[in-house]
UniProtKB/Swiss-Prot annotation:
Residue span of region Mitochondrial targeting sequence: 68-113
Family: Belongs to the orthohepadnavirus protein X family.
Entry protein name: Protein X
Organism: Woodchuck hepatitis B virus (isolate 2)
Keyword Glycosyltransferase: no
Coarse class of the protein's main subcellular location: host cell
Gene that this sequence comes from: X
HAMAP family found in the cross-reference section: HBV_X (MF_04074)
Lineage: Viruses, Riboviria, Pararnavirae, Artverviricota, Revtraviricetes
Length: 141
């Protein structure tokens, strides 16, 4: 069975937070540095409630030397699972209209917060199903 993980990038600490999606599991926990992070294990942030990750349901590829294969993303809207696309290509295409790639994250956050405050958030913003191999299935919230 594929592991279901919920991921969130904490840019303030440069940490990718992964949490099991579904039934809770027990086991040791540790923070996972974000992809592309130059931080070494000695300079990684100290564990906290926000960055703990139960290991009981993680896929075998998670601890591989080259990193988890969940970093090779495909994505699809849950309502149109027939047409999956490569997440990296989709993300790059969405950025083409932006004057700077640095503006991408603030732009999306601003759009999400505005829609949330207006009470008109589109459910499609939270139903991308991400995956990259047979080891796991991730949902981006």
């Amino acid at each position: 069975m594929a592991a279901r993980l919920c991921c969130h990038l904490d840019s303030a600490r440069d940490v990718l937070l992964l949490r099991p999606f579904g039934p809770q599991s027990s086991g040791p926990s540790f923070p996972r540095p974000a992809a592309g992070s130059a931080a070494s294990s000695a300079s990684s942030p100290s564990p906290s409630d926000d960055s703990d990750l139960p290991l009981g349901r993680l896929p075998a590829c998670f601890a591989s030397g080259s990193g988890p294969c969940c970093l090779v993303f495909t994505c699809a809207d849950l309502r149109t699972m027939d047409s999956t696309v490569n997440f990296v290509s989709w993300h790059a295409n969405r950025q083409l209209g932006m004057p700077s790639k640095d503006l991408w994250t603030p732009y999306i956050k601003d759009q999400l917060l505005t829609k949330w405050e207006e009470g008109s958030i589109d459910p499609r913003l939270s139903i991308f199903l991400l995956g990259g191999c047979r080891h796991k299935c991730m949902r981006l919230l």
